[in-house]
Amino acid sequence: MNATLRANILFGREYDEDYYWKVLSACALTDDLEMWPKSDMTVIGENGMNISGGQRARLALARTVYSRADIYFLDDPLSAVDAIVKRHILDNIILSTGLLGDKLRFVTTNADNILPLCNQIATVDNGRVSVKVQTPQVHTAFEFKAATPKPAKAADST
């Protein structure tokens, strides 16, 4: 989308300055904006400034958080960010301490190290929930992995 960062985040919604800047900070975008020529009014996209994959992921997350929905489906929101930004996003958005702390959050991830932070964990296999664990039963990612059935091996075609 060729538009300013702000327009990309607002996505047609009313501008709430305080909440907007809270979201940018929680999504670890404020440091990036300090380096951009027009801060959040910089045009990004094909006809504007190119942004990195990590910045795109954080922009998409900011747009989602700014929507103020009651339910959030986050598809691997931590995959394109480094460990420091990952921790920042967990603390400031996803976990109970974050902006979405009082919302229902469904998060897909391949990051086993965050599993102990979840209050429920479900493994989906072939479109069905194959394992569901409540946190009191999960103490480490290793214990969860031990409870998760291994996928069947694909037949050798050679």
Q: Could you tell me what each predicted segment is?
A:
Residues M1-D16, T108-L117:
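ABC ATPase nucleotide-binding domain signature region
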Residues R6-G45, R68, I89-I93:
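ABC ATPase nucleotide-binding domain helical subdomain, centered on the C-loop/LSGGQ "ABC signature"
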